[in-house]
């Protein structure tokens, strides 16, 4: 009879030991025995807040100001040389340009604002974490979903932090304990 045409998950590879005639296992493992992934991808708590959006907008504004530093002067000259049809609109634009120029002239103020945004962001993060640990519901969401089935499961999972998650069953603590107890 011939061999079955199936892949061997653990082919007999190794040498026989002289004492008991058993095969000595090698360090080669089949790909199916390796863990599927090594880290658990977790969702961020809360989601995007107003402070995140402000920080992103502020970052975009500073980038546009940096890119347009030389072009503001050229645009101002072009407007003054233009026709007088849109005097009110151009005066409004000039006043906003003046505000932008003040911001560019005072990099210290920009730094202070940036530091204040960072401080408020870190304060909000720590407040959200402490609120989540104490069970308070913040303005970041939650709502009825936190009390639903998957929300309760998430809380139980967070409470059982002592156990480490492993996708590799043969290397998990549970399996190792099982082998220690039942095999001798």
From Swiss-Prot:
Principal localisation: nucleus
Region (Disordered): 1-184
InterPro entries in the cross-refs: Cwf_Cwc_15
Biased composition (Low complexity): 119-133
Keyword field: mRNA processing, mRNA splicing, Nucleus, Spliceosome
GO cellular component terms given for this protein: catalytic step 2 spliceosome; nucleus; Prp19 complex; U2-type spliceosomal complex
Cellular localization per UniProt: Nucleus
GO biological process: mRNA cis splicing, via spliceosome; mRNA splicing, via spliceosome
Basic and acidic residues composition bias: residue spans: 55-66, 108-118, 174-184
GO molecular function list: RNA binding
Domain of life according to the entry: Eukaryota
Biased composition (Acidic residues): 85-107
Subunit structure: Associated with the spliceosome.
Family from the record: Belongs to the CWC15 family.
Role this protein plays: Involved in pre-mRNA splicing.
Protein name: Pre-mRNA-splicing factor CWC15
Organism in which the protein naturally occurs: Eremothecium gossypii (strain ATCC 10895 / CBS 109.51 / FGSC 9923 / NRRL Y-1056) (Yeast)
Gene: CWC15
């Amino acid at each position: 009879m011939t061999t079955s045409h199936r892949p061997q998950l653990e082919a007999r590879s190794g040498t026989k030991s002289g004492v008991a005639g058993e095969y000595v296992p090698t360090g080669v493992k089949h790909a199916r025995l390796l863990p599927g992934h090594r880290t658990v991808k977790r969702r961020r708590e809360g989601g995007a807040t107003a402070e995140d959006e402000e920080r992103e907008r502020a970052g975009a504004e500073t980038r546009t100001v940096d890119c347009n530093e030389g072009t503001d002067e050229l645009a101002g000259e072009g407007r003054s040389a233009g026709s007088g049809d849109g005097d009110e609109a151009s005066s409004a634009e000039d006043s906003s340009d003046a505000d932008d120029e003040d911001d560019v002239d005072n990099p210290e103020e920009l730094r202070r604002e940036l530091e204040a945004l960072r401080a408020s962001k870190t304060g909000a993060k720590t407040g959200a974490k402490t609120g989540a640990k104490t069970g308070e519901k913040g303005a970041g969401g939650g709502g009825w979903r936190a009390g639903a089935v998957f929300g309760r499961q998430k809380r139980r999972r967070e409470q059982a932090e002592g156990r480490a998650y492993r996708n590799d069953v043969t290397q998990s603590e549970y399996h190792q304990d099982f082998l220690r107890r039942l095999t001798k």
